[in-house]
Amino acid sequence: MDIQFTTKSQDALGAAVRIAAANGNPQVEPLHLLDSLLQQGEGIATALLSAVGVDVPGLTFQIRGALTGLPSASGSSVSAPQLSQAAYKVLNAAERFAKERGDEYVSTEHLLIALAKDGGPGVSDRLT
């Protein structure tokens, strides 16, 4: 994958991997990415969601609850979480949105748009 990400987007992806690992999830899902965007204290994602009337604390609570329902594994043979097909779909959609706007880098705004449009059940329906 040769998508170029802004620093904030890279931070969000790294946080999504850490969230998945902390929960014992073998794959990084769009839910992890959304949770990581919501955790960026002064990030644009929470500001945009608040501006359109989303109850961000309520959404965060819902997402955290949904994360507990994802498959998990434990033990010494568990490897680092890998991106799921759904997460790849979101990243590719974010890259497409960035290119459509003439942007060279995928920003957190592009990730949020991609999650809303292509995040799949449990993500897109919470954002639209």
Predicted regions span which residues?
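Histone-fold recognition with a strong bias for associated Lys/Arg-rich disordered tails
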Residues: 1-128
